[in-house]
Regions:
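A structural signal for short hydrophobic beta-strand segments in well-ordered beta-sheet cores
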Residues: 65-68
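Internal helix-loop-helix
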Residues: 1-38, 42-43, 85-91
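A generic structural signal for well-ordered coil/turn residues at beta-strand boundaries
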Residues: 21, 45, 59-63, 87-90, ...
Length: 182
């Protein structure tokens, strides 16, 4: 109902990121990670899913961004494309490959990365619908072990579920826009 109403009024707000990241936290987060849900729900913590890449062609398993273990944490390198509100997000849910080849379903891990982390750079731009997106570059971004969301290498299944919820929300938004256009 919320996304249908947003579509009915053509509201370009960062709620999709809140839905996607919130759902992922709810399903796979530790208690400490889930504590961020309060800020997402209150609207004081802007969250974004940073998954699509320049050559991914909407295939969830095509992840070239890498995460390698570094002491007690991880170092992320790669590029993310069309990250909704990515240059404004305070929390990024980043997919990265911890093992396997670029097209493998296994080996994708999910990381919670502060939007202002050292090594994260963003080029933001407006979208035709009035929304905002960004191209992100992750260059030697260091995060702690507690940034890993869920099990290492098992992020694909969670991505499928979360993106499925997002597609339902976008369908409702489209329905609202079409209803308004009648």
């Amino acid at each position: 109902l919320v996304f249908e109403a947003l579509g009915n009024h053509l509201v370009a707000e960062p709620l999709l990121g809140a839905l996607l990241v919130g759902r992922a936290l709810t399903e796979a987060g530790t208690d400490a990670q889930k504590a961020q849900l309060e800020g997402i729900i209150a609207g004081t913590l802007l969250a974004a899913l940073a998954h699509d890449e320049p050559a991914s062609h909407y295939e969830l398993n095509r992840v070239a961004t890498t995460a390698r273990k570094d002491g007690a944490g991880w170092v992320l390198n790669g590029a993310k494309a069309v990250v909704l509100f990515g240059d404004q997000a305070q929390l990024l849910l980043v997919s990265a490959r911890t093992s396997g080849a670029v097209g493998d379903e296994a080996g994708i891990s999910l990381f919670l990365v502060p939007g202002d982390a050292a090594g994260v750079s963003a080029r933001g731009y407006g979208r035709i619908d009035g929304g905002h997106a960004a191209e992100l570059t992750l260059s030697n971004v260091k995060v702690g072990a507690d940034a890993l969301l869920g099990a290492e290498g098992a992020g694909h299944a969670l991505l499928e579920r979360v993106v499925g919820f997002g597609l339902l929300a976008l369908s409702a938004e489209s329905l609202g826009a079409m209803d308004k256009a009648k």
